[in-house]
Regions:
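Helical "lid/coupling" subdomains associated with nucleotide-phosphate turnover
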Residues: 1-136
C-alpha cells in the first residue's frame, strides 16, 4: 500500500502498526467509552458509584482490564471492580430453562429494560468526537 508502518516484532514473524490501526483503536475506544458515559448519565449515575462492571463473552474473557483502563476504554475505576464473567448469555439461558423462578425473575427484569439508540443520541455524538483524543 505504501502506508508507513512500525515493526512491533522481529522480521521473522512481522507484526506491524500503522496509522490506520491507531485510528481504528481511537474509534473503538471512543465508541465504547462514550456509550458507557451516556448510559451512566441516563441512569443518573457516576462511574464512581458503580460497585461492579461485568465483562461477558469473548470480549470480556480475553481483554486486559488494566490496559483497558489505561487506554481509556473503561472509566478510571479500581481494577477489582471490573470482573471477567465469561459466557453470561449461555448461563442465563440455562438458568431460565432449568428454573421457573429464574424465568419469572427474568421476565420481571426484562420489563425494566430501556432501549437507548446511541447512534441517534446527540450527546453520544458529542462525546464520541471528544473521546477520540488519547489525552482524556
Amino acid at each position: 500500500k505504501g502506508e508507513r508502518r512500525f515493526l512491533l516484532t522481529d522480521e521473522k514473524h512481522p507484526v506491524y502498526l500503522t496509522a490506520g490501526d491507531v485510528r481504528q483503536l481511537q474509534l473503538s475506544i471512543s465508541a465504547i467509552l462514550s456509550g458507557i458515559e451516556v448510559l451512566l448519565k441516563k441512569a443518573g449515575l457516576a462511574s464512581s458509584e458503580l460497585n461492579r462492571i461485568y465483562l461477558a463473552g469473548a470480549f470480556g474473557c480475553y481483554i486486559d482490564i488494566e490496559s483497558s483502563i489505561k487506554t481509556g476504554l473503561f472509566p478510571k475505576l479500581p481494577t477489582e471492580k471490573i470482573l471477567q464473567a465469561g459466557n453470561l448469555a449461555g448461563t442465563g439461558a440455562a438458568m431460565v430453562l432449568l428454573s421457573s423462578h429464574a424465568l419469572l425473575k427474568m421476565e420481571k427484569e426484562a420489563g425494566n429494560i430501556v432501549h437507548v439508540e446511541l447512534a441517534e443520541d446527540e450527546e453520544f455524538k458529542e462525546l464520541f468526537l471528544f473521546n477520540m483524543n488519547f489525552v482524556n
